[in-house]
Amino acid sequence: VDLSTPRRKRRLAAETNEAVMSTYVRQFLCLKDNYGVLVHDSATGATASIDAPDGEAVIAAADAAGWTLTDALVTHHHADHVQGLPALRARYPKLSVSAPAKEAARIGGVDRPLSEGDYARVGRLAAKVIETPGHTAGHIVYWFEEEEIAFVGDTLFALGCGRVFETPPAVMWGSLLKLASLPGSTEVYCGHEYTEANARFALTIEPDNAVLKARAGEIATLRAAGKPTLPTTIAAELATNPFLRAEEPTLQAAIGMPGADPAAAFAEIRGRKDRF
């Protein structure tokens, strides 16, 4: 899927002049249901791969766009997000790999270990690092604030969230709250195309959510046509994603937990999804 049109334009003020630059995002499916994503800064020519699920697919996408990869921004250590790194390093010897500091040893070959509040740079673009433990203990998200884009790996999915493998559910809930606090207009790119299955589950939690029902129909139409359901937005997820709505009274009533601690409600929903 080629989304390599300008996603956002911003102005950088210098002392005596202004430069207008565009950020380009190219998203493509690889492996079974992973998304590869390239971020390109046209002002400098810098290009980053968000994770590296399939090195050859990433290289092919970069070649098709006429871009040279300069960076890899890794969200977490799982194999389907890092197994392409050796191929990328072989093709691009000057590649700089950024990754969670807490998982750098496990990933290997990390040039820039990153923690909460650090910045990853792609040319003149700057992504603030948000630590989102839960799916893995060191998972991070890259938030390009000025471009209003977040690359969330496997922490948040459209209508879903990642399985909680390495922390208690309450920790994952805290991570989701961080993402929920981003501006509603933020475009969200996730690691997988899971949306249609997530919609089926979400409707078992909130069958009377009219916005969710309408969105599920739109998703079915997109997938039937072989089109992606991503990016999503924070606003869309707050309205329809049961995992972000665990503190909503209507959702808590729907799962039989009125007035519950939101972290407990989240854990209940996550457990139901694991068994779905």
What positions do the PLM features span?
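Short, Lys/Arg-enriched N-terminal segments with co-localized hydrophobic residues
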Residues: 7-20
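Conserved beta-strand hairpin/beta-sheet module of binuclear metal-dependent hydrolase folds
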Residues: 21-69, 141-153
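Core dinuclear metal-dependent hydrolase active-site scaffold
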Residues: 38, 119-145, 149, 181
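Divalent metal-coordination and catalytic microenvironments
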Residues: 39, 51, 76, 132-135, ...
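Active-site HxH/HxHxD metal-binding segment of metal-dependent hydrolases
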Residues: 47, 54-131, 148
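Active-site metal-binding loops of divalent metal-dependent hydrolases
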Residues: 52-53, 77, 102-103, 135-136, ...
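Active-site-adjacent loop/tail segments of enzyme domains
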Residues: 160-186
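Accessory terminal helices/loops
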Residues: 177-187, 196-276
